[in-house]
Regions:
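Acidic, contiguous segments within the catalytic cores of piggyBac-derived transposases
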Residues: 1-194
Length: 194
């Protein structure tokens, strides 16, 4: 009920921020990704690998993903291809590499905590807006800091709060798949059978 299109086929899509669909694969059950990839990477990272096969290597692209597709394994796989990834992530997927980030209760609105892996190729950032959001990135960290406007219940007006660059870019670049869905809905071609 909370998904925009709960019915129909499940399709994994790689899209540009402007909604242009670059690649897609239909979910076909356990045969969607290889068993070897599934064991090594898990489903989310395996789908990232599958979709990124069409992305030219060594062009230093940055892929933005939601929490289902973001993990340390997917970031490391893409780094081997000189492709970067930024995405929200579930706490159980950050491993011991970046597990000492501050929690929701330790941060005030507009504050963040950043940890960088020993090889300095991956960083984890937790930023508190109304709730905290956890991101992993191999292409950008919290610097330079930007700002954003958010509604303050106490002041009853919009206030400016600091926002790490990784959050700013994630918000700016995500949404291409949803935009592509909207474009397709606007251009539906109905086929009638006799």
């Amino acid at each position: 009920p909370t998904k925009p299109n709960p019915l129909g086929l499940k399709c994994f899509v790689l899209a540009a921020p402007d909604g242009l669909v670059l690649d897609f694969h239909f979910y076909t059950g356990k045969d969607t990704v290889s068993d070897a990839d599934m064991k090594e990477l898990g489903l989310g990272a395996s789908v990232v690998k599958l979709l990124c096969e069409s992305v030219p290597q060594n062009n230093m692209h940055c892929i933005y993903t939601d929490r289902f597709f973001t993990s340390i394994k997917s970031l490391d796989y893409l780094l081997e291809r000189n492709t970067y990834q930024t995405g929200t992530v579930m706490k159980n997927r950050i491993g011991r590499v970046i597990d000492k980030l501050k929690t929701d209760t330790q941060l005030k609105r507009g504050e963040w905590d950043e940890k960088v892996r020993e090889d300095e190729k991956v960083c984890g950032v937790t930023w508190k807006d109304n709730k905290s959001v956890l991101l992993l990135s191999s292409c950008v960290g919290s610097e330079p800091v930007t700002t954003c406007k958010r509604w303050s219940k106490e002041e009853k007006k919009k206030v400016t709060i600091p926002q790490p660059m990784v959050v700013n870019l994630y918000n700016e670049k995500m949404g291409g798949v949803d935009l592509g869905d909207r474009f397709m809905i606007l251009n539906i071609c109905y086929i009638h059978t006799c």
